[in-house]
């Protein structure tokens, strides 16, 4: 669907028996929220926006200044096909504004949009792709999630070892119905672990797609009596789940990641910026205490380094051709806010370009074996959420690029997570129990 005017939207609502319209957005951690507007009230909502209590959303507003307004992005309209066909449900992604129309510092979509505009001013087009992994678990007789994966399959296995094949098919077909472009679907390394990848798109479109993808997976899994979890490390003895971010840059129609990458080229400087700021970005790409159980094993990096092909590196350049040429950042996990994660990775790369950073030499060693890193002098990613918060709070780069309100409230909420974990009698079980159903 592609609609640009309010009248286009109203005509579509009438022609398609739409009765409910969701105005969707997310808090600073990427948890999706929404308010449903009945179709009869949609004209006013499109004209004036929808007012809501920002003090009730994590990291948004104080009680004494709580009013905020949702402004729908008309280009994101879509029907939710798993909802009833009679009295259909439609959804927009929204930006968040202050009541006077001024920008709101916690509007994560707005932050990503502003970073992308800076690239456009340089004549650079950014394409972003996301590889999202997730687990599928059985529910008990009362419909509550268990820790029992739906199968004992492994990487690229087929049925009957792969019990999620039909569910992945339903997810991909639903994505296509909603205008998304799934590319690959397969069983991952862990028991009950799955991956579905989307074709690359613009940064904002990809972040919207990640949010919608998680919504689709949960809805279809629930309909099938299965629990879907995007927790980075739901099972201690199985692979962690990542959200690998793939990025390519185009200038004058040419993919800057195609061919050899000179250390001082635009692509080289972009990569250098991402590597230089990777430690301070980690609190945004890996926002849970549980996230840090994934690093250093199961194809999740620990060291700040890059290479071609090598999956033990933080950044790698896949050996592909043409428009598929790209860099892949392997640290992010699916608990992150995709607007902030993608926006900050792009901002780090832009900082590298603007300051003409020079890309370091590649590290062609298997860094999943810690002994291979000895003597190389490599930085490591933070080993805990608390360490990640400290790195971010000390970052001059983040003070420059992030709205102060968003940064300070994000860090404060993350420190609360650290304190809650410290006071838990069983920290590992606390975080799995506390986040297992929510992420």
Model regions: which residues?
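Glycine-rich, acidic/polar active-site loops that bind/position phosphate-bearing ligands
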Residues: 1-439
